[in-house]
């Protein structure tokens, strides 16, 4: 039995196709991902895992001119968290992090009571993914009156292994 499954939402995390992918993968002995080859035409036998996360920080709104001390800025907190998140990146090991968007606040004269950041993290191994998830789970607020919550998950990496190489060699022979 051969199943071909085309999806169109890979670049946004396979949100609608994820379950179909998992269902077919669970019933399959082998899976080929028909992603474009490398620039020199070489096939890929490994692929980084991709983590898509959202950080939501809540604070306490206050008038910035009348009583700024009664507020707790979600924007100031998220700025501190972004600096800490940068420690996750390690280009030498292939771990990359991008804060794609930050949103927060309502007006310049109001201490922001909410801020959000979208986070993209790429990892070469499942061990790296677990370490990153643990790091994100342990984040704590640094400013009194704020809270930090992170949600999201990883699409696991394809790590080069003996079984992956065997499948690659079989595909080469058949081609």
Which residues are covered by each model-predicted region?
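Acidic/histidine-rich catalytic neighborhood of metal-dependent amide-processing enzymes
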Residues: 1-48
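Metal-dependent amide/peptide-bond hydrolase catalytic core
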Residues: 36-41, 45, 51-56, 60-175
């Amino acid at each position: 039995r051969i199943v071909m499954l085309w999806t169109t939402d890979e670049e946004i995390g396979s949100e609608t196709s994820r379950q179909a992918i998992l269902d077919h993968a669970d019933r399959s002995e082998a899976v080929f991902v028909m992603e474009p080859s490398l620039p020199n035409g070489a096939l890929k036998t490994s692929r980084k895992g991709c983590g898509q996360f959202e950080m939501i920080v809540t604070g306490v709104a206050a008038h910035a001119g009348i009583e700024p001390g009664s507020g707790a800025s979600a924007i100031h907190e998220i700025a501190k968290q972004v600096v800490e998140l940068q420690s996750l990146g390690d280009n030498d090991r292939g771990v990359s992090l991008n804060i794609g968007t930050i949103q927060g606040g309502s007006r310049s004269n109001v201490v922001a009571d909410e801020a959000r950041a979208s986070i993209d993290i790429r990892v070469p191994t499942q061990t790296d993914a677990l370490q990153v998830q643990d790091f994100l789970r342990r984040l704590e607020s640094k400013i009194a009156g704020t809270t930090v919550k992170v949600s999201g998950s990883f699409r696991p990496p394809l790590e080069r292994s003996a079984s992956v190489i065997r499948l690659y060699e079989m595909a080469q022979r058949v081609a």
